[in-house]
Amino acid sequence: MSEDKPEGATHLQNEKPPDEEIEPEELLEVAARALSARASLPDPTDQILLSPNYTSGWPAGAPEGVTIHTEEGWHDPSVAWLRNPKSFASAHFCIRRDGKIVQLVWERDRAWHARSSGMYYFGIEHEGGSGLGDVPILWKTGRNADDLRDDDHMLIQSARLVAYLCTKHDIRIQHDFERPPVRDSVSHIAGHDQMMGNDHQDPGPEFPWRAYMRRVERFANM
């Protein structure tokens, strides 16, 4: 894909995804993922539905972090839109409210999920909204984050995925709770609202960052 394709996320629409089968070389990628997982945490991905919207490879020094998004919509139409070439948008992963993790872009490639700083970060979308629009928040309050035993399946699986990515790719498990733009902070796990060069506000002020980061750290140390 060309470098000048837009990389900003858009409002997600209910579009039919392109028909697509996993090619033989992509099966090799799945095998490589399994081998890599032996040296890191288990890969928690449940399903692979590849998007054509990506840029091959990463810039030097990347990936260096993870961006947390909300879909501002529902899971199935969101995944469909991010797999539609007309959207010029994608994410590495989308997580459904019940915790199902769908991968859209290989870890070796760049997804189109945030302008500027996004080219250095993995992108993870979460079903529902940020609380700043018409789409409701679908995560829970983050209670019992220390023992990982509450019913917030989406954010528990999200934390598990982030811990996997951080341990595999040597990304620091760190979030700047003062919330400055990511290039002015030490956040390696950041909200979309912290990405430089964009005007998005997700995951919103109600996102339970402290509980979420405790979960990521717990999973990384299991």
Question: How would you label these PLM feature ranges?
Answer:
Residues M1-S117:
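N-terminal catalytic cores of peptidoglycan-degrading enzymes
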Residues S2-T45, V135-M222:
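Basic/polar, cationic surfaces and motifs that engage anionic cell-wall
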Residues G65, Y121-G123, H188-A190:
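Structural preference for beta-strand elements that scaffold enzyme active sites
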Residues W74, S130-L132, G197:
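Feature marks short, surface-exposed loop/turn motifs that line or immediately flank catalytic pockets
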Residues R115-D134:
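Short coil-to-beta-strand
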